[in-house]
Amino acid sequence: MTLYDKEINKNSLLIPMVIEKTSYGERSYDIYSRLLKERIIFLTGTIDDNTANLIVAQMLFLEAENAKQDIYIYINSPGGVITAGMSIYDTMKFIKPNVNTICIGQACSMAALILTAGKKGYRYCLPNSRIMIHQPIGGYNGQASDIEIHAKEIIKVKRKLNELMAFHTSQSINTIEKDTERDCFLSANQAIKYGLIDTILSYRT
């Protein structure tokens, strides 16, 4: 068993279980599986390929279950790998159900793009959440010609991300480029004014 496996096993012990009584007896679910029945998906922690694959699989499953019912993604993430985040983004746009996004805690970097990519009018934030947008971070070691190739690629990626952010927020490309030159933190109220979200949720109605 590797240290990684031990860490997974340790974390799995912390996941609450829910017991439901049915006509066939009792059935137990981990809390995330139970919430998935309510079409709720959690995007938490760093966005990597493994996390993205799980989120994508859950969205595809919920679409297969009911293509007309909304999906809810709760986000508390510092961001992560661009390609992993884009796989989530593209799947949100690919599937038929509307995807509602809710920021709880923080939505930074790629997580901010996923948050603002939710269905227009159904992008939410809790009152004390924060959102951070910035330009992509990259680093590469190797031959000069390879470094040049990767530098050109990250510039193209930056341009694409800025275009998507501008589309979803209705901000100009110039504004997005200026604001993402450095880490740009926004409160829930600032995020509404910026166009990243639509509503702050203080309590259930």
Swiss-Prot record:
SUPFAM superfamilies: ClpP/crotonase (SSF52096). CDD domains: S14_ClpP_2 (cd07017). It catalyses: Hydrolysis of proteins to small peptides in the presence of ATP and magnesium. alpha-casein is the usual test substrate. In the absence of ATP, only oligopeptides shorter than five residues are hydrolyzed (such as succinyl-Leu-Tyr-|-NHMec, and Leu-Tyr-Leu-|-Tyr-Trp, in which cleavage of the -Tyr-|-Leu- and -Tyr-|-Trp bonds also occurs). One of its GO terms (molecular function) is ATP-dependent peptidase activity. Its main location: cytoplasm. Pfam families: CLP_protease. It is an enzyme of class 3 (hydrolase). Keywords: Cytoplasm, Hydrolase, Protease, Serine protease. One of its GO terms (cellular component) is cytoplasm. Its EC number is 3.4.21.92. It comes from the Bacteria. The active site is at residues 109, 134. Signal peptide: none annotated. It is found in: Cytoplasm. One of its GO terms (biological process) is protein quality control for misfolded or incompletely synthesized proteins. HAMAP family: ClpP. Cleaves peptides in various proteins in a process that requires ATP hydrolysis. Has a chymotrypsin-like activity. Plays a major role in the degradation of misfolded proteins. Belongs to the peptidase S14 family. Fourteen ClpP subunits assemble into 2 heptameric rings which stack back to back to give a disk-like structure with a central cavity, resembling the structure of eukaryotic proteasomes. NCBIfam families: clpP, PRK00277.1, PRK12553.1. This is ATP-dependent Clp protease proteolytic subunit. It comes from Buchnera aphidicola subsp. Baizongia pistaciae (strain Bp). The gene is clpP.
